From Swiss-Prot:
It is found in: Cytoplasm. Its cofactor is Zn(2+). It is an enzyme of class 3 (hydrolase). Binds up to 2 Zn(2+) ions per subunit. It is not clear if Zn(2+) or Mg(2+) is physiologically important. This is Ribonuclease J 2.
Length: 557
């Protein structure tokens, strides 16, 4: 039975996130007058985003066309695929489609943010067919580090638009992690119009090390440990957590988790049967001291840098629950991103100083949850797409993936390297990239959504780098005189007691500026404040080569 609904006229593919970056996945596919959102993820802030908690895609384009949106389709349950859903649903109404575990994690996110909105959830699997006016949508099982991951297939009259989600190929994994290569091959034979595919490891040659080999290595490493064992692991890597549980059970060690980020997702997945946990294996963290050190494993978990931060606090004897002791062994079951390498190196030194032994990783093992070069080429060769769109990676990774596609037979002119907001448009004859829609980042700080922009970040950088300089003056405008002050206050700029001459010079300059302003025919407070900013900034820079944030405060009596 054909899954094509009707002859289509117009197709648009628009990345709003997940290109030029490893996170924040969001891809819009429009077929005629229907719009479909593929993933809705978040990103954790970069170092320069001071005070920002998370980053989500700007969905202004979707809001402007919300009547066309038929649903949010989710590939898997990681935050960079589902983390923005609760924020989006506060702004628009849309049904949400995903696997059983993925939707359970979305609902938990909604609950944790106290988003009380009635949402239509549709649980899908590899057998599901979702029927719409212009297209049908089906799904296929993929392998990732979290169970129930899906690829998404939009059937059009030109062929299928396939979104792989984040994937790798590993035949050693079974059950909830087994890739459905047979169904992928069927989709390829039916005809793939465009393949939107994960580029994260496009620069890594070969294949990933099979997970059964990795588990064997973990066992060999743990079996040599005589004392307490601490494992650093991402809360999102369910495969690695299961392997640590398996190994601990074989070695007759109890397991305890250290890290709040894991608690909700782990408990949800555990209740739903996605973890295989022997009876009495787990113990509360406050009971670890009741067991001999050679009979426990502590898994320090979290998102992004949280596991490393926990280890650092433990090494410095500052952790609220547990600290490193002489004779502890530490195993890092995480892959270091570029911006984490220095932090990890510093933490390892702290751990060694505190008396811990760092279990070395086998350099021959490459344990990623994303496909390496040969796995990416395998997906391309299975799907045989007419057009290819590399996503989910930094731009250099997208370029590397584009090269793999070309080597696999996709013509260069049919490979599209896109940035956020680019519109790939097919009108029935030609596929072109000649439009752009509104796109970018929405920064979330606490409960504020989108109220932190470039100007706020600039101010935070100024405060962090050069401090703040405040000049307070009280005026008597009726008599055109200074009633009190100027009073100078400074934080993070200079040590006031050692800079009394500079403070006096600044005070005199403020007085001079204010008195000049008071002599004007019409007193303009804004002009006086701006003159204070400009002239004080110049004075301070000439003396210190620093540019603190200058805040004039003028009050009246």
């Amino acid at each position: 039975m054909s899954l094509v609904k009707k002859k289509n006229d117009d197709i648009r593919i628009i990345p709003l996130g997940g290109v030029g970056e490893i996170a924040k996945n969001m891809y819009i596919v429009e077929v005629d007058d229907e719009m479909f959102m593929l993933d809705a993820g978040l990103m954790f802030p970069e170092d320069e985003m001071l005070g920002v908690d998370i980053v989500i895609p700007d969905i202004q384009y979707v809001i402007e066309n919300k009547e066309k949106l038929k649903g949010i389709f989710l590939s898997h349950g990681h935050e960079h695929a589902i983390g923005a859903v609760s924020y989006i649903l506060e702004q628009i109404d849309a049904p949400v489609y995903g696997s059983k575990l993925t939707l359970a994690l979305v609902k938990e996110n909604m609950k944790s943010r106290n988003v009380k909105k009635k949402v239509r959830y549709y649980t899908v699997n590899h057998d599901s067919v979702m029927r719409f006016k212009n297209v049908n949508i089906t799904f296929f099982n993929t392998t990732h580090s979290i169970p129930d991951s899906l690829g998404i297939c939009i059937h059009t009259s030109y062929g299928s638009i396939v979104y792989t989600g984040e994937f790798k190929f590993d035949q050693s994994l079974q059950g909830h992690y087994t890739p459905d290569i047979k169904r992928m091959a069927e989709i390829g034979e039916e005809g793939v119009f465009a393949l939107i595919s994960d580029s994260t490891e496009a620069e890594k040659p070969g294949y990933n090390t099979p997970e059964n080999v990795i588990e064997s290595h973990i066992y060999d490493a743990f079996a040599k440990v005589k004392g307490r064992l601490i494992v650093s692991c991402y809360a999102s890597n369910f495969i690695r957590i299961q392997q640590v549980l398996n190994t601990a059970s074989k070695l007759n060690r109890k397991v305890s988790f250290l890290g709040r980020s894991l608690e909700s997702s782990f408990n949800i997945a555990r209740k739903m049967g996605y973890f295989d946990i022997p009876k009495d294996l787990l113990i509360p963290i406050n009971e670890v001291g009741n067991y001999p050190k050679n009979e426990v494993v502590i898994i320090a978990t979290g998102m992004e840098g949280e596991p490393i931060e926990a280890l650092s606090q433990m090494a410095q004897q500052k952790h609220r629950i547990m600290n490193i002791e002489e004779g502890d062994s530490v195993y890092l079951a995480i892959t270091a991103s570029a911006n984490m390498e220095v932090i990890i190196a510093d933490t390892l030194n702290e751990l060694v100083r505190a008396g811990a032994y760092i279990i070395p990783n086998n350099k021959k093992i490459h344990a990623s949850s994303h496909g390496c070069m040969e796995e990416l080429k395998m997906m391309i060769n299975i799907m045989k797409p007419e057009y290819f769109i590399p996503v989910q990676g930094e731009f250099k990774m997208q370029i590397a993936h584009a090269k793999l596609a070309n080597e696999s037979g996709v013509a260069p002119e049919k490979i599209f390297l896109v940035e956020k907001g680019d519109v790939i448009h097919y009108d029935g004859k030609d596929m072109v990239l000649n439009e752009k829609v509104n796109s970018g980042n929405i920064l979330i700080d606490g409960i504020g959504v989108g109220d932190v922009g470039n100007i706020v970040l600039r101010d935070r950088h100024l405060l962090a780098e050069d401090g703040i300089f405040i000049a307070v003056v009280t005026l008597d405008p009726k008599n055109r005189r200074i009633a009190a002050g100027p009073e100078i206050q400074s934080r993070g700029f200079v040590y006031v007691r050692e800079s009394e001459e500079l403070m006096k010079e600044a005070e005199d300059k403020v007085r001079e500026i204010v008195e000049a302003g008071l002599q004007e025919k019409r007193i303009e407070w804004s002009d006086i404040k701006q003159n204070m900013r400009d002239q004080i900034s110049k004075l301070l820079f000439e003396s210190t080569k620093r540019r603190p944030m200058i805040i004039p405060v003028i009050s009246e009596i």
